């Protein structure tokens, strides 16, 4: 099983819960085929964070490596939001771009 941490940087964008759900659905659709070929299944962990929490997540990523295979950071304050992140082996999917 592949575990993907999806961390949302919250901004002042409206209706963020709905946007978060929509983004996760896009990620599932975009990633599921590639992930299933390598790992068998995909489990997504969602979290919301501000800049300081995000910095902590990145700093502690190596210590928490066994907890997830990839980290995507999504900025909800951008009009054309994007999700970019490294997904470690054995997965072949290295970068995701998700647009509205």
Model regions and ranges:
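Generic secondary-structure microfeatures
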Residues: 8-12, 27, 47-49
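Short S/T/G/P-rich N-terminal loop/turn motif that feeds into the first structured element of a domain
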Residues: 1-21
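Short amphipathic alpha-helical segments
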Residues: 14-34
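Generic alpha-helical secondary structure signal
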Residues: 18-21, 52, 91
């Amino acid at each position: 099983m592949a575990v993907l941490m999806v961390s949302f940087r919250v901004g002042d964008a409206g209706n963020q819960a709905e946007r978060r759900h929509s983004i996760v659905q896009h990620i599932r659709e975009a990633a599921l085929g590639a992930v299933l070929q390598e790992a068998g299944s995909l489990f997504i962990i969602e979290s919301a964070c501000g800049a300081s929490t995000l910095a902590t997540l990145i700093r502690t990523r190596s210590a928490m490596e066994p907890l997830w295979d990839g980290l995507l950071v999504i900025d909800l304050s951008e009009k054309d939001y994007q999700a970019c992140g490294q997904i470690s082996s054995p997965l072949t999917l290295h970068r995701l771009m998700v647009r509205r």
